[in-house]
Every structure is written in C-alpha cells, then in structure tokens.
A protein has these predicted regions:
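Charge-rich, low-complexity N-terminal segments
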Residues: 1-110
Length: 110
C-alpha cells in the first residue's frame, strides 16, 4: 500500500510538471508562431499517468483555428526538443487541442 503522503507528493509533482509544460508551451508558441493569429495556452492536462499531455489553446481570430492547430501539430517535435533542452522532465506525448471556452478541448471541425 502506498502511504498517503507519497500519493500527495506524487500528485503535487504531476501538477507542477503540468504547470511547467503549459508555461514552456506558451513561451515556445510566442516565439515560433506567426502574426496571422494569436494562439494562447489556456491550460495543460496530464493524462495516462503522465504519458500524455493535452495542451489546450485558444485562437483569435477563430477562423484561423484550423491553421493554428495544423501549425502546432507540425511543431510538436520541435516543442518536444524545446522541453528536453529547457526542463528536466520525463517527456510525455504532446497533443494540442482547441479549448472551446467551457473547459473542454476539441479538434477543429473540417
């Protein structure tokens, strides 16, 4: 059985890693994205015991959401490299999702 303190410590580490990845994603996007749209990191969510990380973004203007997510998908490997260079975290698989304003992520409609 895992002691209660270990569970709390593990959850706190996971939350901290999620915050760091969200912050690094915001910095990376600000540096790499063009000026056609404004891409803002809303939050990150760790799933599958930290093996995957969903990064929720908003895009303005909304009409540029598909292009922005396509850009982020193309930059996924570069972002992983950025994380490796700037953090000492175990690297999860990163997925970028559009935040629909209700705390739920969605892929852009085709």
């Amino acid at each position: 059985m895992i002691p209660p303190d270990a569970k709390h410590s593990s959850r706190k580490q996971s939350e901290r890693a999620t915050e760091i990845i969200a912050h690094e994603a915001a910095q990376f996007i600000a540096r790499e994205a063009g000026t056609e749209s404004l891409i803002t990191v809303i939050r990150a969510q760790s799933i599958a015991h930290g093996d995957r990380m969903n990064i929720f973004v908003s895009v303005f203007p909304v009409e540029k959401a598909r292009a922005a997510l396509a850009f982020l998908e193309r930059q996924r490997e570069s972002f992983s490299k950025h994380l490796k260079e700037h953090t000492h975290l175990r690297l999860p698989r990163i997925d970028f999702l559009l935040d629909n304003g209700e705390g739920v992520g969605e892929y852009p409609k085709s």
